[in-house]
Amino acid sequence: MSHHYSGPEWGFPLGDARLDLTDLYAFPKPGDTGKSILVMNVHPSASENPPGPTITEPFSPIALYELKVDTGGDAVADIAYRVYFSSSEGGAQRATLRRVEGPQAAGTGDGGQIIVEGALVSTGDRKSVV
């Protein structure tokens, strides 16, 4: 996880740390170079080793977290991965990931194939993988 603040005057987008895209990584999948792994870091921590989540709702439930991929070399997205997070319920958030292909990938919206639905978001020192 990144431990830095970005943007003008070290501020966050709209004053909300949950909207701060801190890093983006893309690399080939080990053992299958025909596939890629994409990682997006958001919401920087305030210290090198925070004892837990820095706030009770680490992802904004009104934001769209999105990665767009251009596979045609024309600077227009051909694939989009869109992640929405629920409001915190009982101290936990859930995530839904959609994959959008074709012309709709260049825009925004709720369409696309659901890849992961309602997955529990892991925070703190206990991680879970879907």
Features from the language model and the residues they span:
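Surface-exposed extracytoplasmic segments
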Residues: 1-130
